[in-house]
Amino acid sequence: MSASSMVKRAINGSLLACLLIAAPGHAQKTEPVWGYKVRPGDRLIDIAKSYQKNPDDWKKLQQSNTVPDPKLLQPGKQINIPVADLKQGDPFAAAVLVHGDVQRLDKSGQPVAKVVSGDVLKMGDTIQTGARSTLTVRFADDSRMLVTEKSKITLSSLVNYGKTGMADTKVQVHQGGTDSQVSPQKGPVARYEISTPALNLAVRGTGFRIQVDEGNGATRTEVVEGLVAGESQGSQAMIAAGFGILAEPGKALGQPTRLLNAPVLGETSNLVKKLPARFEWTALAGALRYRVQMLAVVQGNDAIIVDEVSDNNKAQWDELPDGDYRLRVRGIDASGLEGANATKAFTVKTRPEPPELSLPKNEHRSVDEKVVFRWSVAPQAQDYRFQLAEDAEFKNLVAAVPRIAGSNRAVLFAVPAGQYYWRVASITSTGDVGPFSDAFTFTRSAAATQ
């Protein structure tokens, strides 16, 4: 199916209708209600206490839902409660993870307070992320938004309808980028909407990215999964997964275009034991450049620690702390739209650093049966781990000493004639074992006969 036919078909869908209903001039004619399905043992008064602002309104529920006996409810029956009567929780969101410099701004746009992980964000807050800084926000319905570097957003609406699970979330993105993972929006007033200087977006459960230019407010939207309804200057479009759209202030929306496929990452180990960490990917047809992101995984949440645009199909990092990471790479087309992610999870474990091997030197040859192995002092090392093998993969171990006191830094072994490989790892005072050093090889030749 072509992008054009997909758009025409989707415009008739319910999501775009929801967007239009929410827009000015399209007010709902009937009062919205939320439906509660009766469970065994439920009483009408208990339902009212749990979900209504005024528990005494259970009598009104009895009348509007035609309930003969408020203490004897039929399991499975739906009790309709006017949305206007529903309890509302506190209007807030949570700063789940902050990386770098993230600030609350006052009405004049000046920073007034730093945002840290665990902070409560309130309706009306304007938040700004600095360079190489990100913020992950969790909303009342468990939807999440990753705010990328050099961005500014305002939390316009954070209505929380308590135990119903419904939330009415509206965010203004003034500049920069966001990456949203939206929980399925169930219920008549459950909404997740984003507005920018060029575009209004509404979703009912999806994953999508937006990027707003700081200069003119032009907005690029890329849908990763689900559907997103867009509206600008009276024109509407539905953007399906795998499609994106460019919106410019004062201009009607064009048709969504297909995003680039994900590039193919080269084969690399999931464990990086020695820096630099190097990655390559196949050149992608239609990609002028590539977005390269390194995400640190902290308590199950992603923090973007590197966000670069590259002209090359390779990247490397000379310094990365030990930890779990995800690499994301996607192509950027001629209109600036970014395609599907190629993703790789990996772990960096380079510390404590191994010592430098001293004797026997690499590729040394000797006729001595007894061989002394020596190495240098390594930072953070209290003790050392030693291995001697007949093969470079260390599958056939000749000797393995799990812990050697750091004051020694030497071991002695008698070995028969043959080629050998040896290596050493550092152990900290807490028992943390680092990666092994690069192996040295040596050959012990048979002694010449007299």
Cite the ranges covered by each PLM segment:
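Primarily a LysM-type cell-wall glycan-binding module
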Residues: 27-52
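Extracellular LysM carbohydrate-binding repeats and other cell-envelope/extracellular binding modules
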Residues: 30, 50-90
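Flexible, surface-exposed loop/linker segments and immediately adjacent secondary-structure boundaries
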Residues: 74-78, 82-275, 387
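Conserved aromatic anchor
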Residues: 277-286, 371-381
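Short beta-strand segments within Ig-like beta-sandwich modules, predominantly Fibronectin type-III
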Residues: 305-311, 400-406
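Surface-exposed, short loops/turns at beta-strand junctions within beta-sandwich domains
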Residues: 317-324, 412-419
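Extracellular fibronectin type III
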Residues: 335-348, 429-444
